[in-house]
């Protein structure tokens, strides 16, 4: 069979780091300095090189795409967006998958590779870690996996505070980018572009506002509105 087993130490990722909090902070950090990243080619190259080296080291030590699952800030961002996808790969009959002993969809077969995303397609119930490559459909000997359409935004269940915070961080960053990059105000733009202007005090203020809005103000506002909605809905 075409197994995707890789070399390395194959250690388990630490459970206490298995939530999205690390990715959330890395994503927020990268976006806070994004104006610098896109205007300084040397810094852009250094960040990309650091990510590649980190991915190689983590892959050599840990198993199951640990870098993508638990460290890569962009993967967390993509996983939230995938919940709004209009298509999904799912079993036709979950009972047949439960009776299957080979699980070729995950481990591979003579006809196709195992899941390159290293999930078990027979147990998929959300899109967050599925890349829709459809390799599992070719691998399944029982033809029990399919791709199907679904209503937009039908998979919006948040399974933890870390996922909820990531969604709120994304909203806060949209507001921040609108003000600093698209708005008519020159002062906030100069704060974010510290390497051109040299206003480090303004940049620190910019970062403080963005982080406070993303981690405190917006979650507090969302929580307050949720409580009001619950109160008035009975």
Feature-to-residue mapping (PLM):
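Membrane-embedded alpha-helical bundles of multi-pass integral membrane proteins
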Residues: 1-98, 119, 137, 143-144, ...
């Amino acid at each position: 069979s075409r197994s995707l087993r890789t070399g390395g130490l194959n250690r388990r990722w630490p459970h206490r780091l298995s939530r999205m909090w690390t990715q959330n902070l890395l994503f927020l950090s990268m976006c806070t300095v994004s104006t610098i990243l896109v205007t300084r080619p040397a810094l852009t190259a250094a960040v990309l090189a650091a990510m590649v080296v980190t991915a190689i080291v983590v892959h050599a030590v840990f198993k199951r795409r640990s870098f993508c699952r638990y460290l890569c800030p962009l993967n967390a961002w993509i996983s939230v967006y995938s919940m709004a996808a209009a298509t999904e790969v799912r079993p036709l009959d979950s009972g047949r998958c439960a009776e299957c002993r080979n699980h070729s969809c995950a481990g591979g077969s003579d006809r196709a590779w195992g899941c390159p995303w290293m999930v078990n397609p027979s147990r998929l119930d959300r899109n967050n870690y599925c890349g829709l490559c459809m390799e599992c459909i070719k691998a399944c000997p029982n033809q029990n996996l399919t791709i199907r359409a679904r209503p937009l935004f039908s998979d919006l269940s948040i399974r933890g505070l870390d996922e909820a915070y990531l969604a709120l961080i994304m909203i806060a960053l949209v507001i921040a980018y609108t003000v600093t990059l698209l708005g008519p105000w020159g002062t906030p733009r100069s704060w974010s572009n510290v390497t051109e202007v040299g206003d480090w005090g303004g940049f620190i203020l910019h970062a403080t506002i963005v982080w406070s809005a993303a981690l405190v103000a917006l979650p507090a506002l969302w929580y307050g509105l949720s409580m009001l909605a619950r109160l008035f809905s009975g």
